[in-house]
Amino acid sequence: MESDVQRPVSLLLNRRGGDYRSDFHNNQTPSNNSKDVEGGGGSFSSGKWPSDYPMKIIWKRGFVRLVLVAGILWMLLILAVLSFHVWSCQSSSVFFSVICNKESKVYNFLNTWGFVPEQHRCPIPVVGNPERIVIPEGRTHDQIVKNISYVMEDEPLKDGSQSSQLFGGHQSWKQREKSFNLSSSMKVHCGFMHNGGADMDLVDIEYVKNCRFVVASGIFDGYDVPHQPSNISDRSKKLFCFLMVVDEISLDFIKANVTVREDHNRGQWVGIWRLILLKHSPYDEPRRNGKVPKILTHRLFPQAQYSIWIDGKMELLVDPLQILERYLWRGKNTFAIAQHKHHRSIYEEADANKRRKRYARPLIDLHMKIYYYEGMESWSPKKSSVSDVPEGAIIIREHTAMSNLFSCLWFNEVNLFTPRDQLSFGYVVYRLGGAFRFFMFPNCEYNSLFVLHPHTREHSSKVEWVKSLSEFKGNGSSMKESRGGLGLWTPYPGDLNSVALPKVVRASKAG
């Protein structure tokens, strides 16, 4: 009897649709079995199945399966979107590479969990023990430029009045042209004009007087907090000054987010970094302010003989003595900078800057037209340098007269035109006609020198979205920088209307 009851139950649980009912009635025997079941109560008490029972089972199972399938499809969709995001950042396609935002929270999350392919890195051939590195005696003497001095005040205007005080001064086109004519003794614009801003506290001025070896960095407009370097030897800790240049906004931000200690001389510290406050920011644009300590390191710290600049979002991984030995002393260089990972031509770099909205598109075009008019060709293997475009996040220098002159001329271009310093580097090299010798090392070594941390927030300004010069008229005039980039608004002594920029053919990934 039990087997008779179990048989229709098993059939019911393993079949669908009308088969349930037909099999059930075909196998059910109208005998006392129903009474026996009836006495037991439960779902069998009626002697037959409820008419809607099979459909309930079907709907329940179907709903569960639907939820599972929908969940799987949703997970696959999310995975596909994330994979596409990572792939777009690695793509050499113009369209897809523009979509990528390496500073987004999604990208940083994927990078943190190891889903983003590691940057191209290679071992750096450094001396194993910093304690054994021999530091050269004396200074490197230049053969061409032996003495350099700086313009500190602008010439009076034609009516005898003084022009407004600007950090970079009011360099004329004639003065700019003259600055590229090399002689043994030169006087050039190099920032820090009288009453132009970027003032240091007296306590910091006194401190840096004792700094011969410098690791410098900078944070402006509160975009980062200091990252402590790793693998620093005891010798380097004693030898180097680690100087973090900040503006007032960043100092307040740092104090609110990390521990800042004050020594007995009122010096402010975050770990190994001595904070150097620059009061009275010289520019409206925070990115342009950051070029002051980056390019004019020799002006901020005039007693320094050697300096290593690293961007504020970077964590240094290699001992600074090993860096100086590898990139300067071993090859008898006085200036070293990394090759850009993707671009060799400044026109390709300018194209990438426009696509990624790093500055106003028409102003980048104007900047490049001036350079092309003045003879700056696209990079080719015929050039003596391996690239016209550097990775400017790390700069290694001995502060010789020629190295200092190059830094001044480079800064003057950044001051006159767009704040994108990578666009001006190769131009200054070109104008010096081979007199400035430098070491441009492989990008894979550059990526092995540091860990790159994301900014605390993304940078954005209205000027970056400008597509036409007409947008600067009327209410848009407020987007014009009032203290930098004035060369973009000063009539140029040449016909730029006839200039057609070289066509950019993208053969590499976007940087």
How does the language model describe each region?
Residues 2-511:
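Glycosyltransferase catalytic domains, chiefly GT-A lineage
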